[in-house]
A protein has these predicted regions:
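Beta-strand/loop-rich accessory regions of lumenal/periplasmic or secreted enzymes
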Residues: 4-294
Length: 294
């Protein structure tokens, strides 16, 4: 019961961010390509019951109370979740009047302990400009207002903006996670996170890098995610012209991204450097969501 049933956008894919002042030029390309109106379209869905690796705290390397009881058996490879449900979906990131922005093969594995492992193979159409971000967005209960994360903090950090941050475990309230900008724009991100926990009112949601499977390369094993927990949606921060116009959504807005593109300096300087753009033709994104009792 972490995710609010009253929310309009309980869970969705996202590629849009509220444009920063430095996005003032590229935002016109993003909007022309429909990034601000993009949504996920399913082309094929298959489900099956599987026996797969359990995603318990020991496997994830984090602490926290389980939500419900773990149902597991032991084998030579360790704990195995019994009767996990695997949902495979062929999807597209689409917008009106344009071809699919990206194709996605998505697998959700719902384990007996309540954890959900997510793996996405993403193939971006090279005809489109680089993405502002790619990940998932969830609207959690407003009462889940306490955040702890392991990543670059305590100041906001991005792939090209992190010299004032360091790796560690940090805690803050959701109201403290954002940066109050006079002109609302993207803010409050934390780069290279290995886990994050959002909690309140007796429940918590743990977010951990990886889906429990063996990575194909050491780089994949070490890759963290970008994490954000704010009072406002990206759409609201895009709409508002001044900070006093912002309307809190009434939920805790959580974003977990494979990556956000960098901030750059294109309001008065050069375009964002290629190494800081999310423009890879193909990438894999894997995280695990685990409900807990706080």
């Amino acid at each position: 019961h972490c995710i609010s049933s009253a929310a309009s956008d309980v869970y969705k894919r996202q590629i849009w961010r509220a444009p920063t002042d430095n996005d003032r030029n590229v935002r016109h390309e993003w909007e022309r390509c429909g990034y601000d109106r993009a949504y996920a379209r399913a082309y094929d869905v298959q489900t099956r019951t599987v026996v797969s690796s359990g995603i318990g705290e020991a496997a994830l390397g984090v602490d926290g109370g389980a939500y419900g009881e773990e149902t597991a058996v032991e084998d030579a490879e360790g704990p195995m979740a019994v009767n996990a449900v695997e949902i495979k979906c062929s999807m597209g990131a689409v917008a009106p009047t344009v071809q699919p922005i990206a194709r996605m093969d998505t697998t959700w594995t719902v384990h007996a302990d309540g954890s959900v492992a997510l793996h996405m193979n993403v193939r971006k159409d090279p005809a489109f400009p680089f993405l502002p971000r790619f990940g998932i967005h969830m609207q959690l209960l407003k009462s889940m207002s306490n955040v702890t994360y392991c990543g670059l903090g305590p100041n906001e950090s991005y792939v090209d903006k992190r010299r004032a941050s360091w790796h560690g475990v940090f805690s803050a309230s959701v109201s403290q996670m954002g940066e109050r900008e006079i002109k609302p724009q993207e803010n409050g991100n934390h780069h290279d996170c290995s886990w994050a926990r959002v909690q309140g009112d007796g429940v918590a949601l743990m977010i951990v890098q990886g889906d429990g499977s063996q990575p194909e390369s050491p780089a994949e094993l070490l890759r963290g995610f970008d994490f954000q927990a704010l009072e406002y949606t990206a759409a609201e921060m895009t709409r508002a012209r001044h900070d006093f116009e912002l309307q809190p959504s009434g939920f805790t807005e959580v974003s977990v991204d494979y990556m956000q593109s960098g901030i750059g300096s294109n309001s008065c300087g050069p375009e964002l450097l290629p190494q800081y753009r999310l423009d890879a033709p193909e990438f894999d994104f894997a995280i695990t969501l685990r409900p807990q009792l706080a």
